[in-house]
């Protein structure tokens, strides 16, 4: 999708970027995204000043802001999960696992480890510490709340599973999701 800006009174519509933009993360009036045409660098668009800035000249995918850091998939190194600190410019590899997708919940990163022999939904600290298996297999749609993490098997909408976001891992089915899906069929 191209990025456009418009005033709240619907005046002054203008193109901000004449290229595809994946607006992966936004905070405090700044949209963070990776390039999609000539490179996959980290960019920001300041909605107040209208300026686009190159923040990190490194190829990445799905930049996600948490605190003062951008978490991203490293497209040059088998999609390992990394963290780029916007304050000091440091870059840290959090896991060398190939990662399909991830989500951040406070002090944890939940991610799908892509491994032909042992795929798993994983959880680790935001600094890459203490990786642990949440559930063996391939999962998608990792959604986090203040209480629970929800996910389901890749390619299947049900059942939806849940586990505590911050407490001990204890995966169970989220039965309310199943009931809603069955009701939608009727």
Kindly label every feature range from the protein language model.
Residues 1-5, 38-44, 77-83, 117-122, ...:
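Structural motif
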Residues 7-11, 45-50, 84-89, 125-129, ...:
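Short loop/turn segments that connect beta-strands within beta-propeller blades
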Residues 8, 25-26, 36-37, 45-47, ...:
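Generic beta-strand structural signal
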Residues 12-17, 50-56, 89-95, 130-135:
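A short beta-strand motif characteristic of beta-propeller blades
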Residues 18-28, 57-67, 96-106, 137-146, ...:
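Repeated scaffold domains used in trafficking and secretory/extracellular systems
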Residues 31-34, 71-73, 109-112, 150-152:
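Residue position within the beta-strands of beta-propeller blades
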Residues 127-130, 148-150:
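Acidic, low-complexity, intrinsically disordered interaction modules
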Residues 136-185:
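Blade-level signature of beta-propeller repeat domains, shared across WD40, Kelch, NHL, RCC1
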């Amino acid at each position: 999708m191209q990025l456009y800006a418009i005033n709240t009174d619907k005046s002054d519509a203008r193109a901000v970027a004449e290229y595809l933009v994946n607006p992966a993360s936004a905070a405090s009036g700044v949209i963070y995204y990776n390039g999609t045409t000539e490179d996959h660098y980290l960019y920001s668009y300041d909605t107040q000043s209208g300026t686009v800035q190159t923040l990190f000249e490194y190829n990445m995918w799905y930049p996600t802001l948490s605190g003062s850091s951008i978490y991203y998939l490293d497209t040059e190194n088998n999609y390992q999960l990394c963290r780029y600190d916007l304050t000091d410019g440091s870059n840290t590899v959090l896991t060398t696992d190939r990662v399909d997708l991830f989500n951040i919940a406070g002090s944890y990163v939940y991610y799908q480890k892509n491994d032909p022999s042992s795929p798993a939904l994983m959880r680790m600290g935001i600094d890459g510490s203490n990786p642990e298996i949440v559930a063996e297999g391939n999962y998608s749609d990792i959604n986090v709340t203040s209480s629970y993490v929800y996910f389901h098997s890749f390619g299947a909408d049900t059942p939806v599973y849940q586990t505590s976001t911050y407490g001990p891992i204890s995966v169970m089915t989220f039965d309310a999701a199943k009931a809603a899906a069955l009701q939608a069929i009727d």
